């Protein structure tokens, strides 16, 4: 009864109006699952391949018909007849069918869409929530959210090199309250920006993209918004995080961090050592709890120095650095580079590999942050993954745009469903930092 009888993919649009995949999996019992695939703007060079058509006459070359055809004509034939509950076997079969190290033949977007849809169909068959199916009876931790309220870098037209300025309600008693805190700060920030005559249009992830005078102006403005909303900045209230996305402004030939790419003439150009110094200055000055991709994805020496200097005080998250890949994570653990991994399901391409990366991180004392992409959909699977794995943290955008809010609303539902079992750890989510 739980045998897969049909797999079907179609092309749909993501939050940027670009094509992506939606996959449906059907079983003998009538149980059904649907998965949608996100897409990134700033992507690591080691990520699994997102298959695009390249036909400039259609969707500017970004069409996904090849990936759709791969699902409907190749993957479907291979997995029809499998028990939908056998997630690992299905994921392994798709990996073998692709046969490349980066899923470049069938496309990670094709494989991931099927992987998500299979899990959802299995949960439907068993008549349990997705987070329960994925995580079992020990599922209980609601993630502390990283809320991206100011967008810079490749996510907006704002003249700021750092891609994301985030707030984290680490002092909130519950996820529901933490979400309220974040929303109130978001609205306080909007009011402050208006009073300064700055634009309040939002970027890809729902954060504002104003023309600040630089990084510190952005941080100072967020601190004012926290205060205006009636909260305190720090461990008992709200703390700040960055996604530097440093690979986006790292000049490989000159081996420098060239802030002029986003901030224009007169902006800083820093060596690897100077980049570490700069980040340390910011940490010393402001209530910063997390920094993502503070160094370029290939600047291993820089990462090791940054970790030595700040790794006990601040969460140092590898995104482009690790690309949700256990091979890169294992090297980072061995060489003491970073202390946290960002988990993006489409960077690696299957739920099985995603869970393996989270497990490896936890075993090494690294934290794991489950994350969206800048090109999102209404699919809320990552909310269930965050709770299923007790990851403790989620990064899913600002407090606007339905593609972001869909994940927050799903977490509110999960917290309600878990009832008294639900835990929100806040500052304790950073279990590898010494306070």
Swiss-Prot record:
Gene (name only): eno
Cofactor notes: Binds a second Mg(2+) ion via substrate during catalysis.
GO CC terms: cell surface; extracellular region; peptidoglycan-based cell wall; phosphopyruvate hydratase complex
Protein name as catalogued: Enolase
Main location as per UniProt: cytoplasm
Residues that, per the record, bind substrate: 155, 164, 292, 319, 344, 371-374, 395
UniProt: Mg(2+) binding residues: 243, 292, 319
An example Gene Ontology biological process: glycolytic process
Active site residues according to the UniProt entry: 205 (proton donor), 344 (proton acceptor)
PANTHER family in UniProt: ENOLASE (PTHR11902:SF1)
Enzyme Commission designation: 4.2.1.11
Catalysed reaction equations from the record: (2R)-2-phosphoglycerate = phosphoenolpyruvate + H2O
Cofactor: Mg(2+)
Presence of keyword Magnesium: yes
Organism: Streptococcus pyogenes serotype M1
SUPFAM superfamilies the record matches: Enolase C-terminal domain-like (SSF51604), Enolase N-terminal domain-like (SSF54826)
Lineage, uppermost ranks: Bacteria, Bacillati, Bacillota, Bacilli, Lactobacillales
Subcellular localization, as worded in the UniProt entry: Cytoplasm; Secreted; Cell surface
Summary of subunit composition and partner proteins: Homooctamer.
PROSITE patterns according to UniProt: ENOLASE
Entry keyword annotation includes Membrane: no
HAMAP family listed in its UniProt record: Enolase
């Amino acid at each position: 009864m739980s045998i897969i009888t049909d797999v079907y993919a179609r092309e749909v649009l993501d939050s940027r109006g670009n094509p992506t995949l939606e996959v449906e999996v059907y079983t003998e019992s009538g149980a059904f699952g649907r998965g949608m695939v996100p897409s990134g703007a700033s992507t690591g060079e080691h990520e699994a391949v997102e298959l695009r058509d390249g036909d400039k006459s259609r969707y500017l070359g970004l069409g996904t018909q090849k990936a759709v055809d791969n699902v409907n004509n190749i993957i479907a034939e291979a997995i029809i007849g499998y028990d939908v509950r056998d997630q690992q076997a299905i994921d392994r079969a798709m990996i073998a069918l692709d046969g490349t190290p980066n899923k470049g033949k069938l496309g990670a977007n094709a494989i991931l869409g099927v992987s998500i849809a299979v899990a959802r169909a299995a949960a439907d068959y068993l008549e349990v929530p997705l987070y329960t199916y994925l995580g079992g009876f020990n599922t209980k931790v609601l993630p502390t959210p990283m809320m991206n309220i100011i967008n810079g870098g490749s996510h907006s037209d704002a003249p700021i090199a750092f891609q994301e300025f985030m707030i984290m309600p680490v002092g909130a008693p519950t996820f529901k309250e933490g979400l309220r805190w974040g929303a109130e700060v978001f609205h306080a920030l909007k009011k402050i920006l208006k009073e300064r005559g700055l634009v309040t249009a939002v970027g890809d992830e729902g954060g504002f993209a104003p023309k600040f005078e630089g990084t510190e102006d952005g941080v100072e403005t967020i601190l004012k918004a926290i205060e205006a909303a009636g909260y305190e900045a720090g461990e008992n209230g709200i703390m700040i995080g960055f996604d530097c996305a440093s690979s986006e402004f790292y000049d490989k030939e000159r081996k420098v961090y060239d802030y002029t790419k986003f901030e224009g003439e007169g902006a800083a150009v820093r060596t690897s050592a100077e980049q570490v110094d700069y980040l340390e200055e910011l940490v010393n000055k402001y209530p910063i709890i997390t920094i993502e991709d503070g160094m370029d994805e290939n600047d291993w020496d820089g990462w090791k120095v940054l970790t030595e200097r700040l790794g006990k005080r601040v969460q140092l998250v590898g995104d482009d650095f690790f690309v949700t890949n256990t091979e890169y994570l294992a090297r980072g653990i061995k060489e003491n580079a970073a202390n946290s991994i960002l988990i993006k399901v489409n960077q690696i391409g299957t739920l099985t590999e995603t869970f393996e990366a989270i497990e490896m991180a936890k075993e090494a004392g690294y934290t794991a942050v489950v994350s969206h992409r800048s090109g999102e959909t209404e699919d809320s699977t990552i909310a269930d993954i965050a709770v299923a794995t007790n990851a403790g943290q989620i990064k899913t955008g600002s407090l606007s745009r339905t593609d972001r809010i869909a994940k927050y609303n799903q977490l509110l539902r999960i917290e309600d469903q878990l009832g008294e079992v639900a835990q929100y750890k806040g500052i304790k989510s950073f279990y590898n930092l010494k306070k």
